Each structure stands twice: as structure tokens, then as C-alpha cells.
Amino acid sequence: MKRFLLCSFALVLLYPAGIDMYLVGLPRIAVDLNASESQLHIAFSVYLAGMATAMLFAGKIADQSGRKPVAIVGAIVFMMASLLCSRASEGSLFLSGRFLQGIGAGGCYVVAFAILRDTLDEHRRAKVLSLLNGITCIVPVLAPVVGHLIMLRFPWQSLFYTMSAMGIIVGLLSLFILRETRPVRLAPRDLSRSSPAAESLINRFFVSRLAITTLSVSVILTFVNASPVLLMEVMGFSRGDYAITMALTAGVSMVVSFSTPFALGLFKPRTLMLVSQGLFLTAGVTLSLAHTNTVTLFGLTLICAGFSVGFGVAMSQALGPFSLRAGVASSTLGIAQVCGSSLWIWLAAILGISAMNMLIGILIGCSIVSILLIFSVAPNRSVAEHEEIPYQSRP
């Protein structure tokens, strides 16, 4: 079991590393590529577009050909794309490398969740996904620090050499440590009801959890996207103050994420999901009424706590009904989360909504819709019956 957890954690970490590792070198990259920093900021959107593109195909391929091949190919693509970025001499080549990086990271991301669905029951999976969320919160804090230390002695290309090395490590883990988990056959009692056709993505329970997780990701990405404006322009923080504040909010996320597995031993998953949405609603109201920086910071802290306590539980429930189509289910969740959050941020920008109102709107909207869905669409017997761990996996 440890090998599956190690490989899943490694596969997921490529995604945030690809976002945060290079940011510290952005000014130097802009100078060397004769591009403005604002032009290169599109690299974030290009990276997410690559992830969404990979998710369109990676899940189905993983269900048909296995988790291991997709993980290996994804790691290789990420490694090669990182090298391409390091060799870029102009902006378009750099953005092409970022798109390919997203493809590699997206394939690995999908496979990681499919592996956890293959190997863990719902109770253990919810705990592991909460821990995984806590670990991924470490990357946005550590990656800029590591990047800064690297750039003290080496050029910005070394940042992508480091990411390339991460791709190599993940590829080696996938090749030599990871075992195939794609179901070959299920226990005899499951054969009559567990088939790809029976595991439809169009069912009320999955759609409800897809909506909840998509709205939750929209909240956290809106917070990340709006944070520079809120903290530095509206609240008057310096870059140093901004970095410290974001590190502290990431620390809150880590503490809550690592505490959630213990909370699951005391409370029902539904209770934690309601607490999560209650924190979002409280954060939205707090931010709308805030007149001081202290109150605003308290509201931002509630956002991080709310996301950390509920996201892993909701993701675990969403994957629960799928024994044979875990890859496709994971892809669908990833695509909805990336595209849904991007759509909200884009629409808010087009409509000229301020950063604060953009955040307040998604907080209140997410909490109200999610609470209604939690009460109206609860796990039923058919979902519980589908919660099966593959009886036999490939060696």
C-alpha cells in the first residue's frame, strides 16, 4: 500500500510544482526572451489549458490501457517539456513548453486519483485525499523559496532543469515502484452490476459532487488569482508582506488538511462537508462587512480552512461509484474544476467585477448551492454498493 501512496503523492506534486517553481524567475525570463512580465503571465493559463487537454484523453486511456503507462508517459512529457522551456529563446517557444508541461502534469494528476480509487475504500480514501491536499499546500510555499535559492547561484534555466529532474524521479517511481491497479476482474458478486455501462457519469450523486468540487476549486483559485490585488493594491501590503501572508494562509490549509483525517474518525463526511461550506459562507459575509485589514485577513483564513476540510471528502465521494471507470471519472472532475474556475474568473473580468466582489460572489454562491446539494443528494444504497476495491490487479 505504501508504494501506491508514494507514487500517487509524487504524481500529484508535478501539477503545483509546474505552477509555482518558475514564478520567482519570471522577471529574468521576461528580459531574456524579450517579453513583458504581463505577456508571460499567460503561461499560467496555457499550463492549465494543457492540463485540461490531457484530462480529455488520459482518463479513458488509463481505464483501457492501465494507470502505469499513462503515469510513465505523463512524467516523460513533463520532463521533456521542462527541458524545452529551459532552451526557449523567445516567448512562443516558452509558452509551447508550458502547454506541454500541463499535458504531462494533467495525465499524472488524473492517474493519481484513479490509483487511490483503485486501492482504497471510501473511508481511507477521504483521509488520504485530505493528507494529499495538505501536502500540495506545501508546494506553493516551498517552491518559490527553493526557486529563490537556486537563482542565487544559477540562471533561470536551472528552475526548469529542477522540474525536469522531478519528472525523471516520478517516471522512475512509476516504472519501478508503481504496480498496475487497473481492475482486471472484480469479485464474482460484483460482475452482474459492475460494468462500464453501469457506471454512468450522468447520475445525480456524481453530478452533485462534481458541482460541489468545481465550485470549491473556483473559490480557492479565485482567492489565489485575486490575492495580489487584494493584498498589495487594496490593503497596501508590500511584496514581502504579501509573501508572508500567503505562506501563513498555506500554513492554515496544511494544519486543517492534516487534521481532517482525525476529524473523519469523529464526524460523518457529510458533517465535514457542511462545515466546509459554512466556513465559505462565513468568509463571504465577513469579507463583505470587513472595514479593517485584520477582519479581511480573518475572512481569507476561513477560505483556506473551508477548502481544506471539505475538498478531499467531496472528491472521495465523487469517485466512490466508479470501479471500472475511475480514470474517466477523475478526468471529468479535473476538467470541470479547471474549466469551471477559469470560466468564472474570465466572466468576472469581462464584466468588470472587482477582485473583492469576485471573491465574495463565488464564496456565497458556492456555499448556498453546495449546501442545497448536500441536503438534497445524499449517498444512497446504489452508490454504497458500487464502492468496491478491485479484487485483482495486474502485477
Curated annotation (Swiss-Prot):
Record's subcellular location: Cell inner membrane
Highest taxon of source: Bacteria
Listed InterPro entries: MFS (IPR011701), MFS_dom (IPR020846), MFS_trans_sf (IPR036259), Multidrug-R_MdtL (IPR023697)
Database matches in Pfam families: MFS_1 (PF07690)
Keyword terms: Cell inner membrane, Cell membrane, Membrane, Transmembrane, Transmembrane helix, Transport
Predominant location category: membrane
Transmembrane segments: 4-24, 42-62, 69-89, 93-113, 131-151, 158-178, 217-237, 247-267, 271-291, 295-315, 333-353, 358-378
Periplasmic domain ranges by topology: 25-41, 90-92, 152-157, 238-246, 292-294, 354-357
Any Gene Ontology CC annotation: plasma membrane
GO MF entries: transmembrane transporter activity
HAMAP family: MFS_MdtL
Family: Belongs to the major facilitator superfamily. DHA1 family. MdtL (TC 2.A.1.2.22) subfamily.
Protein name: Multidrug resistance protein MdtL
Organism this protein belongs to: Salmonella choleraesuis (strain SC-B67)
Gene from which this protein is expressed: mdtL
